[in-house]
Amino acid sequence: MNGTEGSNFYIPMSNRTGLVRSPYDYTQYYLAEPWKFKALAFYMFLLIIFGFPINVLTLVVTAQHKKLRQPLNYILVNLAFAGTIMVIFGFTVSFYCSLVGYMALGPLGCVMEGFFATLGGQVALWSLVVLAIERYIVVCKPMGSFKFSANHAMAGIAFTWFMACSCAVPPLFGWSRYLPEGMQTSCGPDYYTLNPEYNNESYVMYMFSCHFCIPVTTIFFTYGSLVCTVKAAAAQQQESESTQKAEREVTRMVILMVLGFLFAWVPYASFAAWIFFNRGAAFSAQAMAVPAFFSKTSAVFNPIIYVLLNKQFRSCMLNTLFCGKSPLGDDESSSVSTSKTEVSSVSPA
Protein backbone atom coordinates (compact mmCIF):
# COMPACT_ATOMS: atom_id res chain seq x y z
CA MET A 1 0.00 0.00 0.00
CA ASN A 2 1.45 3.33 -1.10
CA GLY A 3 -0.85 5.45 1.04
CA THR A 4 -2.24 5.79 4.54
CA GLU A 5 -5.98 5.84 5.17
CA GLY A 6 -7.36 7.26 8.38
CA SER A 7 -10.61 8.66 9.67
CA ASN A 8 -11.80 11.03 6.92
CA PHE A 9 -8.43 11.34 5.21
CA TYR A 10 -6.10 9.57 2.80
CA ILE A 11 -2.46 10.58 2.49
CA PRO A 12 -0.45 9.26 -0.49
CA MET A 13 2.47 8.15 1.69
CA SER A 14 3.10 4.89 3.49
CA ASN A 15 3.28 5.19 7.26
CA ARG A 16 6.13 2.69 7.60
CA THR A 17 8.36 5.51 8.84
CA GLY A 18 5.75 6.80 11.26
CA LEU A 19 5.76 10.29 9.72
CA VAL A 20 2.12 10.42 8.64
CA ARG A 21 -0.16 12.49 10.84
CA SER A 22 -3.81 13.49 10.63
CA PRO A 23 -4.17 16.53 8.34
CA TYR A 24 -6.80 17.90 10.72
CA ASP A 25 -4.48 18.09 13.72
CA TYR A 26 -0.88 18.39 12.52
CA THR A 27 1.07 20.38 9.95
CA GLN A 28 1.84 18.37 6.82
CA TYR A 29 5.38 19.60 6.26
CA TYR A 30 6.60 16.02 5.80
CA LEU A 31 4.74 16.08 2.43
CA ALA A 32 6.48 19.22 1.16
CA GLU A 33 8.69 22.04 2.38
CA PRO A 34 6.92 24.82 4.32
CA TRP A 35 7.62 27.37 1.56
CA LYS A 36 5.56 25.31 -0.87
CA PHE A 37 2.55 25.60 1.41
CA LYS A 38 3.14 29.35 1.58
CA ALA A 39 3.36 29.44 -2.22
CA LEU A 40 -0.05 27.75 -2.44
CA ALA A 41 -1.43 30.26 0.06
CA PHE A 42 -0.08 33.14 -2.03
CA TYR A 43 -1.62 31.61 -5.16
CA MET A 44 -5.01 31.35 -3.42
CA PHE A 45 -4.64 34.93 -2.21
CA LEU A 46 -4.19 36.08 -5.81
CA LEU A 47 -7.28 34.15 -6.89
CA ILE A 48 -9.27 35.77 -4.09
CA ILE A 49 -8.19 39.36 -4.81
CA PHE A 50 -8.86 38.91 -8.54
CA GLY A 51 -11.81 36.53 -8.42
CA PHE A 52 -13.97 38.25 -5.83
CA PRO A 53 -13.96 41.80 -7.29
CA ILE A 54 -14.47 40.76 -10.90
CA ASN A 55 -17.30 38.32 -10.13
CA VAL A 56 -19.05 40.79 -7.84
CA LEU A 57 -18.50 43.57 -10.40
CA THR A 58 -20.22 41.42 -13.02
CA LEU A 59 -23.25 41.06 -10.73
CA VAL A 60 -23.33 44.76 -9.80
CA VAL A 61 -22.95 46.05 -13.36
CA THR A 62 -25.67 43.73 -14.63
CA ALA A 63 -28.00 44.84 -11.84
CA GLN A 64 -27.37 48.53 -12.60
CA HIS A 65 -27.81 48.40 -16.39
CA LYS A 66 -31.13 47.19 -17.73
CA LYS A 67 -29.78 46.65 -21.25
CA LEU A 68 -27.49 43.93 -19.89
CA ARG A 69 -30.41 41.96 -18.50
CA GLN A 70 -30.97 40.02 -21.73
CA PRO A 71 -31.72 36.28 -21.74
CA LEU A 72 -28.23 35.39 -22.99
CA ASN A 73 -26.65 37.27 -20.09
CA TYR A 74 -28.67 35.45 -17.42
CA ILE A 75 -26.44 32.40 -17.62
CA LEU A 76 -23.32 34.60 -17.52
CA VAL A 77 -24.60 36.19 -14.32
CA ASN A 78 -25.17 32.66 -13.05
CA LEU A 79 -21.50 31.93 -13.72
CA ALA A 80 -20.44 35.04 -11.80
CA PHE A 81 -22.68 34.12 -8.85
CA ALA A 82 -21.22 30.60 -8.72
CA GLY A 83 -17.72 32.06 -8.91
CA THR A 84 -18.46 34.40 -6.01
CA ILE A 85 -19.65 31.47 -3.88
CA MET A 86 -16.50 29.51 -4.71
CA VAL A 87 -14.29 32.43 -3.70
CA ILE A 88 -16.08 33.18 -0.42
CA PHE A 89 -16.69 29.67 0.89
CA GLY A 90 -13.98 27.67 -0.86
CA PHE A 91 -10.95 29.78 -1.70
CA THR A 92 -10.77 31.41 1.72
CA VAL A 93 -10.62 28.00 3.40
CA SER A 94 -7.86 26.80 1.06
CA PHE A 95 -5.93 30.03 1.59
CA TYR A 96 -6.01 29.79 5.38
CA CYS A 97 -5.22 26.07 5.50
CA SER A 98 -2.32 26.45 3.07
CA LEU A 99 -0.99 29.31 5.16
CA VAL A 100 -0.92 27.21 8.35
CA GLY A 101 0.09 23.98 6.60
CA TYR A 102 -2.84 21.67 7.38
CA MET A 103 -6.64 21.40 7.26
CA ALA A 104 -6.97 23.56 10.36
CA LEU A 105 -10.75 23.96 10.11
CA GLY A 106 -11.25 20.26 10.68
CA PRO A 107 -13.48 17.76 8.88
CA LEU A 108 -16.37 20.23 8.71
CA GLY A 109 -14.20 22.86 7.04
CA CYS A 110 -12.96 20.22 4.60
CA VAL A 111 -16.51 19.20 3.70
CA MET A 112 -17.50 22.85 3.24
CA GLU A 113 -14.54 23.63 0.98
CA GLY A 114 -14.96 20.45 -1.05
CA PHE A 115 -18.70 20.96 -1.44
CA PHE A 116 -18.51 24.57 -2.63
CA ALA A 117 -15.59 23.86 -4.95
CA THR A 118 -17.50 20.96 -6.53
CA LEU A 119 -20.78 22.89 -6.63
CA GLY A 120 -19.22 25.98 -8.22
CA GLY A 121 -17.25 23.97 -10.74
CA GLN A 122 -20.33 22.01 -11.75
CA VAL A 123 -22.49 25.14 -12.06
CA ALA A 124 -19.81 26.60 -14.33
CA LEU A 125 -19.63 23.44 -16.46
CA TRP A 126 -23.40 23.09 -16.88
CA SER A 127 -23.73 26.84 -17.52
CA LEU A 128 -21.32 26.42 -20.42
CA VAL A 129 -23.45 23.52 -21.64
CA VAL A 130 -26.55 25.74 -21.55
CA LEU A 131 -24.64 28.52 -23.33
CA ALA A 132 -23.49 26.08 -26.00
CA ILE A 133 -27.01 24.75 -26.54
CA GLU A 134 -28.43 28.29 -26.68
CA ARG A 135 -25.88 29.33 -29.29
CA TYR A 136 -26.56 26.13 -31.22
CA ILE A 137 -30.33 26.77 -31.26
CA VAL A 138 -29.99 30.45 -32.22
CA VAL A 139 -27.26 30.11 -34.84
CA CYS A 140 -27.79 26.61 -36.29
CA LYS A 141 -31.61 26.89 -36.06
CA PRO A 142 -32.48 23.20 -35.62
CA MET A 143 -35.92 24.35 -34.39
CA GLY A 144 -36.48 26.89 -37.16
CA SER A 145 -37.46 30.39 -36.04
CA PHE A 146 -36.83 30.51 -32.31
CA LYS A 147 -36.41 33.34 -29.83
CA PHE A 148 -34.47 32.59 -26.66
CA SER A 149 -36.68 34.17 -23.99
CA ALA A 150 -36.28 34.99 -20.30
CA ASN A 151 -38.29 31.88 -19.38
CA HIS A 152 -35.88 29.70 -21.33
CA ALA A 153 -32.94 31.40 -19.62
CA MET A 154 -34.40 30.86 -16.14
CA ALA A 155 -35.10 27.21 -16.95
CA GLY A 156 -31.47 26.88 -18.04
CA ILE A 157 -30.23 28.36 -14.77
CA ALA A 158 -32.46 26.03 -12.74
CA PHE A 159 -31.08 23.11 -14.74
CA THR A 160 -27.46 24.08 -13.98
CA TRP A 161 -28.10 24.17 -10.23
CA PHE A 162 -30.05 20.92 -10.27
CA MET A 163 -27.23 19.12 -12.08
CA ALA A 164 -24.56 20.73 -9.87
CA CYS A 165 -26.39 19.69 -6.70
CA SER A 166 -26.84 16.16 -8.02
CA CYS A 167 -23.04 15.96 -8.12
CA ALA A 168 -22.01 17.96 -5.03
CA VAL A 169 -24.70 16.87 -2.54
CA PRO A 170 -24.37 13.01 -2.49
CA PRO A 171 -21.01 13.03 -0.63
CA LEU A 172 -22.74 14.95 2.16
CA PHE A 173 -25.08 12.01 2.71
CA GLY A 174 -22.77 9.03 2.45
CA TRP A 175 -22.40 8.39 -1.28
CA SER A 176 -18.66 9.04 -1.39
CA ARG A 177 -17.21 11.73 0.90
CA TYR A 178 -15.04 14.83 0.84
CA LEU A 179 -11.41 14.31 1.83
CA PRO A 180 -8.29 16.50 1.98
CA GLU A 181 -6.34 16.11 -1.26
CA GLY A 182 -2.90 16.95 -2.53
CA MET A 183 -0.93 18.60 0.22
CA GLN A 184 -3.99 18.22 2.47
CA THR A 185 -5.03 21.88 2.45
CA SER A 186 -7.92 21.65 -0.02
CA CYS A 187 -10.64 19.04 -0.37
CA GLY A 188 -12.52 17.10 -3.01
CA PRO A 189 -14.46 13.86 -3.57
CA ASP A 190 -12.80 10.61 -2.53
CA TYR A 191 -11.12 9.13 -5.62
CA TYR A 192 -8.52 7.33 -3.56
CA THR A 193 -10.08 4.61 -1.42
CA LEU A 194 -12.24 1.54 -1.95
CA ASN A 195 -14.09 1.97 1.33
CA PRO A 196 -17.33 0.00 0.78
CA GLU A 197 -19.08 2.09 3.42
CA TYR A 198 -19.16 5.06 1.02
CA ASN A 199 -19.63 3.29 -2.36
CA ASN A 200 -16.86 5.42 -3.82
CA GLU A 201 -16.49 3.43 -7.02
CA SER A 202 -20.08 3.89 -8.15
CA TYR A 203 -20.00 7.60 -7.29
CA VAL A 204 -16.78 8.26 -9.21
CA MET A 205 -18.10 6.39 -12.25
CA TYR A 206 -21.34 8.38 -12.03
CA MET A 207 -19.45 11.66 -11.66
CA PHE A 208 -17.09 11.09 -14.58
CA SER A 209 -19.78 9.84 -16.95
CA CYS A 210 -22.71 12.16 -16.11
CA HIS A 211 -20.87 15.24 -14.86
CA PHE A 212 -17.83 15.38 -17.08
CA CYS A 213 -17.99 13.21 -20.20
CA ILE A 214 -21.62 13.96 -21.15
CA PRO A 215 -21.41 17.77 -20.74
CA VAL A 216 -18.02 18.00 -22.45
CA THR A 217 -19.25 15.85 -25.35
CA THR A 218 -22.36 18.04 -25.65
CA ILE A 219 -20.23 21.17 -25.74
CA PHE A 220 -17.94 19.80 -28.45
CA PHE A 221 -20.87 18.63 -30.59
CA THR A 222 -22.78 21.92 -30.39
CA TYR A 223 -19.74 24.08 -31.04
CA GLY A 224 -18.56 21.87 -33.87
CA SER A 225 -21.95 22.35 -35.52
CA LEU A 226 -21.96 26.05 -34.67
CA VAL A 227 -18.56 26.79 -36.19
CA CYS A 228 -19.53 25.01 -39.41
CA THR A 229 -22.80 26.95 -39.60
CA VAL A 230 -21.17 30.34 -38.99
CA LYS A 231 -18.56 29.65 -41.68
CA ALA A 232 -21.23 28.53 -44.15
CA ALA A 233 -23.38 31.61 -43.47
CA ALA A 234 -20.39 33.91 -43.91
CA ALA A 235 -19.48 32.24 -47.20
CA GLN A 236 -23.03 32.48 -48.57
CA GLN A 237 -23.78 35.94 -47.08
CA GLN A 238 -27.16 34.66 -45.86
CA GLU A 239 -27.49 37.20 -43.05
CA SER A 240 -26.79 40.88 -42.52
CA GLU A 241 -23.23 41.94 -41.80
CA SER A 242 -24.12 43.23 -38.32
CA THR A 243 -25.82 39.95 -37.40
CA GLN A 244 -22.88 37.89 -38.63
CA LYS A 245 -20.46 40.10 -36.71
CA ALA A 246 -22.48 39.81 -33.50
CA GLU A 247 -22.75 36.04 -33.89
CA ARG A 248 -19.00 35.76 -34.37
CA GLU A 249 -18.28 37.92 -31.31
CA VAL A 250 -20.60 36.03 -28.99
CA THR A 251 -19.47 32.66 -30.34
CA ARG A 252 -15.80 33.57 -29.88
CA MET A 253 -16.48 34.70 -26.32
CA VAL A 254 -18.26 31.50 -25.32
CA ILE A 255 -15.73 29.23 -27.04
CA LEU A 256 -12.93 30.93 -25.09
CA MET A 257 -14.91 30.43 -21.87
CA VAL A 258 -15.22 26.73 -22.69
CA LEU A 259 -11.50 26.46 -23.48
CA GLY A 260 -10.70 28.28 -20.23
CA PHE A 261 -12.83 25.85 -18.26
CA LEU A 262 -11.26 22.81 -19.94
CA PHE A 263 -7.79 24.28 -19.43
CA ALA A 264 -8.54 24.54 -15.70
CA TRP A 265 -10.40 21.27 -15.09
CA VAL A 266 -9.09 18.65 -17.56
CA PRO A 267 -5.72 18.22 -15.75
CA TYR A 268 -7.54 17.69 -12.43
CA ALA A 269 -10.12 15.31 -13.92
CA SER A 270 -7.43 13.37 -15.79
CA PHE A 271 -5.23 12.97 -12.73
CA ALA A 272 -8.20 11.94 -10.58
CA ALA A 273 -9.22 9.38 -13.23
CA TRP A 274 -5.68 7.99 -13.29
CA ILE A 275 -5.73 7.62 -9.49
CA PHE A 276 -9.12 5.91 -9.62
CA PHE A 277 -8.16 3.41 -12.31
CA ASN A 278 -4.73 2.73 -10.79
CA ARG A 279 -5.60 2.11 -7.16
CA GLY A 280 -2.51 1.54 -5.08
CA ALA A 281 -0.17 3.22 -7.57
CA ALA A 282 2.32 5.62 -6.07
CA PHE A 283 1.83 9.36 -6.58
CA SER A 284 3.04 12.35 -4.63
CA ALA A 285 0.91 14.80 -2.69
CA GLN A 286 2.58 17.65 -4.56
CA ALA A 287 1.68 16.13 -7.94
CA MET A 288 -2.00 16.05 -6.95
CA ALA A 289 -1.89 19.52 -5.41
CA VAL A 290 -0.94 21.22 -8.69
CA PRO A 291 -4.04 20.26 -10.76
CA ALA A 292 -6.30 20.52 -7.69
CA PHE A 293 -5.32 24.14 -7.05
CA PHE A 294 -5.06 25.01 -10.74
CA SER A 295 -8.68 23.95 -11.28
CA LYS A 296 -9.77 26.80 -9.04
CA THR A 297 -8.73 29.35 -11.67
CA SER A 298 -11.98 28.63 -13.54
CA ALA A 299 -13.74 31.02 -11.15
CA VAL A 300 -11.56 33.82 -12.54
CA PHE A 301 -11.37 32.85 -16.23
CA ASN A 302 -15.00 33.31 -17.21
CA PRO A 303 -15.65 36.86 -15.94
CA ILE A 304 -12.29 38.05 -17.34
CA ILE A 305 -13.12 36.62 -20.76
CA TYR A 306 -16.59 38.15 -20.54
CA VAL A 307 -15.20 41.59 -19.68
CA LEU A 308 -12.52 41.50 -22.38
CA LEU A 309 -14.71 40.29 -25.26
CA ASN A 310 -18.16 41.73 -24.55
CA LYS A 311 -18.11 45.38 -25.68
CA GLN A 312 -21.54 46.09 -24.26
CA PHE A 313 -20.60 44.84 -20.80
CA ARG A 314 -17.23 46.59 -20.95
CA SER A 315 -18.94 49.89 -21.75
CA CYS A 316 -21.42 49.47 -18.88
CA MET A 317 -18.65 48.44 -16.50
CA LEU A 318 -16.65 51.59 -17.27
CA ASN A 319 -19.83 53.59 -16.88
CA THR A 320 -20.27 52.14 -13.39
CA LEU A 321 -16.63 52.56 -12.39
CA PHE A 322 -16.51 56.17 -13.64
CA CYS A 323 -19.78 57.15 -11.95
CA GLY A 324 -21.95 57.33 -15.05
CA LYS A 325 -19.41 58.80 -17.48
CA SER A 326 -18.11 56.02 -19.70
CA PRO A 327 -14.87 56.99 -21.53
CA LEU A 328 -16.12 55.02 -24.55
CA GLY A 329 -19.23 57.14 -24.99
CA ASP A 330 -22.78 55.97 -25.68
CA ASP A 331 -22.60 55.32 -29.42
CA GLU A 332 -20.63 52.10 -29.14
CA SER A 333 -22.86 50.70 -26.40
CA SER A 334 -26.00 51.44 -28.37
CA SER A 335 -24.69 49.77 -31.53
CA VAL A 336 -23.51 46.74 -29.58
CA SER A 337 -26.85 46.47 -27.78
CA THR A 338 -28.68 46.49 -31.10
CA SER A 339 -26.49 43.77 -32.58
CA LYS A 340 -26.79 41.58 -29.49
CA THR A 341 -30.58 41.85 -29.56
CA GLU A 342 -30.56 40.97 -33.24
CA VAL A 343 -28.53 37.84 -32.58
CA SER A 344 -31.00 36.58 -29.98
CA SER A 345 -33.87 36.55 -32.43
CA VAL A 346 -32.37 35.46 -35.74
CA SER A 347 -34.85 33.87 -38.12
CA PRO A 348 -33.96 31.20 -40.64
CA ALA A 349 -32.75 32.36 -44.03
Curated annotation (Swiss-Prot):
Its main location: membrane. The chain crosses the membrane at residues 37-61, 74-99, 114-133, 153-176, 203-230, 253-276, 285-309. GO terms for biological process: cellular response to light stimulus; G protein-coupled receptor signaling pathway; phototransduction; visual perception. Disulfide bonds join 110-187. Residues 62-73, 134-152, 231-252, 310-349 are cytoplasmic. Gene3D superfamilies: Rhodopsin 7-helix transmembrane proteins (1.20.1070.10). GO terms for molecular function: G protein-coupled photoreceptor activity; photoreceptor activity. Residues 328-349 are annotated as: Disordered. Residues 1-36, 100-113, 177-202, 277-284 are extracellular. This is Green-sensitive opsin-1. It comes from Danio rerio. The gene is opn1mw1.
